[in-house]
Amino acid sequence: ISGLFAKTSYGCMHQFVYSIIQIPLQGLGGNLWAMCIFTIAAQLLWFFGIHGTNVIAPIYTPIWLTLDLANQASVAQNGIGAGTNIIGKAFFETFTFGGCVLGFVILMAFFAKSSQYKSLGRLSLVPALFGITEPVIFGTPLVLNFTFFIPFVFGNVIAILISYAAIASGLVPTLMGASTIFGLPIGFHAAIQGSWQAVVLQIVVMVILGLVWYPFFRKADNDAYKLEQ
């Protein structure tokens, strides 16, 4: 088989697979709308109690890591902000930090009237600062809770669109594509990507998502407060 591929323009089987499979998939997974589709699919699975990230990640991770590697190579040669791709795994992990529920947790911890949501917010705050959101997802619960369906399923997409626009407009440099470990607190993912603007954008996105969550949180909190009286 190796001899047959050596006689083709691909040169080897690995290059053939890369050209025929990886490049078309990269075209799908390396654009804004594909990322939005992947994200909504993952959040829908989360809504039904399935770990959506683990289910969807094997599809997009190889594609997005390829884009990150291209950014790393470009930054190594030309400096911060020289990345050629806006989209990548680093972009996704930085700007959809913790499933974008940190703002919701802060609302519960500091603005809830009901003891139910206030207690849950305070218990979940520290984990959420480190991107750990299972206490919120299963404690609220957000699973099968149609009160929070819109912000829970579509919040990450809003974060992606805002962040993409900020980078595409030049307000924030493209990320350097650095891989990070899970469990870093908010701000660290962005700082590792090489610019203070990315840190500011991550915080701005969190605030905006908190505003998106607010009307849904207020309704649920008022209902819970009435039941407690």
Regions found by a protein language model. Give the residues of each.
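Hydrophobic faces of alpha-helical transmembrane segments in multi-pass integral membrane proteins
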Residues: 1-2, 29, 33, 37, ...
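Membrane-helix interface motif
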Residues: 5-14, 64-71, 168-176
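Transmembrane helix-loop junctions in multi-pass membrane proteins
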Residues: 5-14, 51, 110-113, 133-138, ...
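Helix-loop-helix junctions within the multi-pass membrane cores of secondary transporters/permeases
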Residues: 65-148, 152, 156
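Transmembrane alpha-helix interface/packing and boundary motifs in multi-pass membrane proteins
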Residues: 40-53, 65-66, 130, 135
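Short, amphipathic, aromatic/basic-enriched membrane-interface segments that mark the entry/exit
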Residues: 24-29, 117-125, 174-175
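Signature of multi-pass transmembrane helix bundles
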Residues: 1-51, 180-229
